[in-house]
Design a protein with these regions (language model features):
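Cytosolic juxtamembrane N-terminal segment immediately preceding the first transmembrane helix
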Residues: 1-34
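Extracytoplasmic gate region of multi-pass secondary transporters
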Residues: 33-34, 224-277, 367, 371
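Extracellular/periplasmic helix-loop-helix junction of adjacent transmembrane segments
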Residues: 36-73
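Conserved MFS/SLC helix-loop-helix module at the cytosolic interface between two early adjacent transmembrane helices
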Residues: 73-109
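Cytoplasmic membrane-interface "Motif A"-like loop-to-helix N-cap segments
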Residues: 84-95, 288-300
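Helix-breaking motifs and short loop linkers at transmembrane-helix boundaries and internal kinks
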Residues: 86, 107-113, 141, 291, ...
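C-terminal ends and interior cores of transmembrane alpha-helices
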Residues: 96-109, 301-316
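Glycine-rich segments within core transmembrane alpha-helices of 12-TM secondary carriers
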Residues: 144-172, 187, 360-371
Length: 415
């Protein structure tokens, strides 16, 4: 009985640590869209910009791209570290990295300073996802995985919504944005909790006893190459859709209101975040219910339709805009409840953190190209909506690719 209680306590500690780690990731991701406009406008004279909209759009795209590339390299590096040294120690270091370097954004004087610091912060964020997912999926029984996948996926969007609520009550200006970044250093305390209280994965311990893994080589080896490349493609499609369009919704809201409604950005971000929490919870259950492949196909189809309605059919800030923001935020985020369920099922324990990290975060590199493209499209079209309408066509590709992947519903995690 004592052993069972200890196991249950360990499972809950793992879940809480992974949830908080990914929630704070979402908070860190939500910070920049909230502060981007005042921060970049403050820095514009140092660079010599003349058009605020074009300057903000261009640098928003560049900094978002750097963020995504940093997350990709972080996912690879910390995933490798998690397979070699253990999930817990690697996750502690990842949380510490993103907390400290978010806080250091306080000292940025030029846009490239922000870009460099966001790159390193993202390095830590990219690692936390793959490590947290591996820990949870290895600690809990198979029957709980669809629900827990949704819970973990929703965590980032809880953080995203929380930072938006802050923006609703605390006006972010050219004088105050730096203090928002300082608040982003708070998750450093979580790193200490992880190191002191969270138990290491028993599956990883058993796998480590069997010999030294070569995780990077193996995930790109003949046995796993197809799974790895398909997982990268699936992550890329979802991430391009999110970072190339949905992340720009607060800026679009600000543009639609002409800057006369300071709360418009925060309300947009809150509704998108709340929709995303619901979507993530349902995404894992959706995949667990009808199967991994039909679920991904359905999410791509719904995302394609709803994004088309939002970006092509809505032309002013109001009730219709806010309803569509909620729906688009939900369906495009449901992928992030599906990924924690499906990606662990594609890789054995000895390389699971690396495989997930490579797949999900290599997708971020391609999403970085999407963010850069979005920035250029905003300049070209002079419209966030037209740019978003083009980028979100990427979901059509996912509707075909998913049928090349294995169906894993009802199968245990590979050892």
């Amino acid at each position: 009985m004592t052993e069972l209680k200890r196991d249950a306590k360990g499972q809950w500690l793992v879940l809480v640590a992974a949830f908080l780690g990914w929630m704070f990731d979402g908070l860190e991701m939500g910070i920049f869209p909230l502060v981007a406009r005042p921060a970049l406008q403050e820095m514009m004279p140092a660079i010599g910009g003349t058009s605020p909209d074009q300057f903000v759009g261009l640098w928003m795209g560049r900094i978002t791209a750097l963020f995504l590339v940093g997350a990709a390299f972080g996912g690879l590096s910390f995933g490798w570290l998690g397979d070699r040294l253990g999930r817990v120690r690697a996750m502690m270091l990842s949380v510490l990295t993103y907390s400290v370097f978010t806080g250091l954004c306080y000292f940025a004087k030029e846009p490239w300073h922000l870009g460099a610091l966001r790159f390193v912060a993202a390095f830590g964020m990219g690692g936390e996802w793959s490590l947290g997912v591996a820990l949870v999926m290895e600690a809990w029984p198979e029957g709980k995985r669809p629900l827990l996948a949704g819970v973990i996926g929703a965590a980032a969007n809880v953080g995203f919504a929380l930072i938006a609520v802050l923006g609703l009550f605390f006006k972010v200006t050219q004088d105050s944005w730096r203090w928002v970044m300082v608040a982003g250093a708070a998750p450093a305390a979580l790193a200490l909790m992880i190191q002191l209280f969270v138990p290491e994965s028993e599956r990883w311990k058993e796998s480590a006893k069997r010999g030294v893994a070569r995780p990077v080589k193996e995930v790109f080896g003949a046995g796993l190459l197809k799974n790895t490349l398909l997982a990268i493609a699936f992550a890329s499609i979802a991430l391009i859709g999110t970072w190339g369009s949905v992340q720009w919704l607060p800026l679009w809201a600000d543009k639609l209101t002409g800057g006369t409604m300071p709360q418009a950005k925060a309300v947009t971000q809150i509704l998108s975040g709340v929709g995303a929490v619901v979507g993530c919870m349902l995404g894992g259950l959706f995949g667990g219910g009808i199967g991994r492949r039909p679920a991904y196909f359905g999410l791509c189809l719904m995302s394609l339709i709803l994004c088309a309605v939002l970006f092509r059919g809505v032309h002013e800030y109001g009730g219709m805009f806010l309803v569509m923001v909620f729906l688009v935020g939900g369906v495009t985020a449901a992928f992030y409840g599906w990924f924690p369920l499906y990606l662990p099922e594609l890789f054995p324990t000895r390389v699971r953190a690396t495989g997930q990290g490579v797949s999900y975060n290599a997708g971020r590199i391609l999403a970085a190209a999407g963010a850069l493209t979005q920035g250029q499209l905003v300049v070209f079209y002079g419209s966030y909506a037209k740019a978003g309408a083009v980028v979100t066509l990427i979901y059509a590709l996912g509707m075909g690719l998913i049928w090349l992947a294995p169906e894993t519903k009802g199968k245990p995690l590979p050892e």
